[in-house]
């Protein structure tokens, strides 16, 4: 499990990732050094990679898109 800070709302969200801690730390280092997220974490799906980048879960994205559609 990793934690991500959701900057937009200031909430802390969690997501379970099917990756061991050592691999996660290694790949995160590659991402932070400039590698594209999809290249650094090819074993993760789009939602999991988005969470690493933003701290936003799929449910939060869906609610944000729904609110935007209502405007």
Give the ranges of each region predicted by the language model.
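N-terminal acidic leader/helix
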Residues: 1-30
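Acidic, low-complexity, intrinsically disordered interaction modules
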Residues: 21-50
């Amino acid at each position: 499990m990793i934690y991500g800070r959701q900057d937009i709302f200031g909430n802390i969200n969690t997501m379970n990732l099917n990756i061991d801690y050592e691999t996660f730390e290694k790949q995160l280092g590659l991402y932070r050094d400039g590698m594209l997220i999809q290249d650094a974490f090819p074993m993760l799906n789009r939602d999991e990679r988005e969470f690493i980048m933003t701290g936003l879960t799929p449910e939060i994205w869906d609610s944000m898109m729904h609110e935007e559609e209502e405007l």
